[in-house]
C-alpha cells in the first residue's frame, strides 16, 4: 500500500514537471518567433525572416521573406 502510494506520487509529479517544461519551451518559441518578419516583408538577411528565407525574386531589386 505504501509503495504504491509513492509510485503514484512519483508518476504524478513527473507528469506535472514534464508538462510545465513543455509550456516553457512553447513560450520561448513564440517569443523568439515575434522577433522575425512574416512572409513577403522586406528583409536583409535569412535570419530576419520567420521562414529563414530572404530572397530576391523577379526584376524587383528588394529582398523579401519567402
From Swiss-Prot:
Xref: InterPro entries: Scorpion_calcine
This protein's record includes keyword Hydrolase: no
Annotated tissue distribution: Expressed by the venom gland.
Transmembrane segments: none
Regions annotated as coiled coil: none
Domain of life, source organism: Eukaryota
A single GO cellular-component term on record: extracellular region
Pfam family, one: Toxin_27
Region (Essential for stimulation of [3H]ryanodine binding to RYR1): 55-57
This protein's UniProt keywords: Calcium channel impairing toxin, Cleavage on pair of basic residues, Disulfide bond, Ion channel impairing toxin, Knottin, Neurotoxin, Ryanodine-sensitive calcium-release channel impairing toxin, Secreted, Signal, Toxin
Entry keyword annotation includes Secreted: yes
One Gene Ontology molecular-function label: calcium channel inhibitor activity
Site (described: Essential for stimulation of [3H]ryanodine binding to RYR1): 64, 66
Signal peptide start and end residues: 1-21
Residue pairs linked by disulfide bridges in the UniProt entry: 36-50, 43-54, 49-65
Cell compartment(s), UniProt: Secreted
Stated role: This toxin stabilizes ryanodine receptor 1 (RyR1) opening in a long-lasting subconductance state (20% and 38% of the full conductance state have been found). It promotes an increase in the opening probability at intermediate concentration. Furthermore, it triggers calcium release from sarcoplasmic vesicles (68 nM are enough to induce a sharp release, and 45% of the total calcium is released after toxin (100 nM) addition) probably by acting as a cell-penetrating peptide (CPP). In addition, it has been shown to dose-dependently stimulate ryanodine binding to RyR1 (EC(50)=6.9-71 nM).
Protein name per Swiss-Prot or TrEMBL: Hemicalcin
The species this protein was found in: Hemiscorpius lepturus
Amino acid at each position: 500500500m505504501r509503495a504504491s502510494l509513492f509510485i503514484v506520487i512519483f508518476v504524478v509529479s513527473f507528469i506535472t514537471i514534464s508538462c510545465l517544461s513543455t509550456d516553457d519551451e512553447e513560450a520561448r518559441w513564440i517569443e523568439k518567433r515575434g522577433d522575425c518578419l512574416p512572409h513577403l516583408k522586406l528583409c536583409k538577411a535569412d535570419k530576419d525572416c520567420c521562414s529563414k528565407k530572404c530572397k530576391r525574386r523577379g526584376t524587383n531589386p528588394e529582398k523579401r521573406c519567402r
